[in-house]
Regions:
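Conserved RNase H-like, two-metal-ion catalytic cores of nucleic-acid enzymes
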Residues: 1-113
Length: 113
């Protein structure tokens, strides 16, 4: 089975993406930025995936998070990041709330001590 990729740009497309991802218990998440520091860089995009659907939200095109912001803040949904500290720094700087974060980089460090 091939993963479906959605790049929503309209409110209806963002709502559709939210409705499809909102049933997931966990989501893989990632950000793309213009630099390594949230003080000088910008948040370009946020990606979400439930394993069947990948959503790339092109913030650099002026697209807003809309209801997808609720997924990042939802304590019932585990958001899986690699090196979450980096992504969360940019998300926090943009005023985007997050909860229930799992960091694969930290997990790897703990498990391979």
């Amino acid at each position: 089975m091939r993963m479906e990729i959605l790049i929503p740009r309209t409110d209806i497309e963002i709502e559709t993406a939210y409705l499809r991802l909102s049933t997931a218990h966990s989501l893989g998440c990632d950000t793309e930025t213009s630099g390594l520091s949230s003080r000088t860089g910008k948040l370009f995009s946020i990606q979400f995936s439930d394993g069947d659907l990948s959503v790339l939200l092109p913030l650099s095109e002026g697209v807003g998070l809309g209801p997808l912001a609720m997924l990042l803040a939802d304590r019932e949904v585990t958001k899986i990041f690699h090196n979450a500290k980096f992504d969360l720094d940019f998300l926090n700087a943009a005023g985007i709330a997050t909860a229930n974060i799992f960091d694969t980089m930290l997990a790897e460090k703990i498990l391979t001590r």
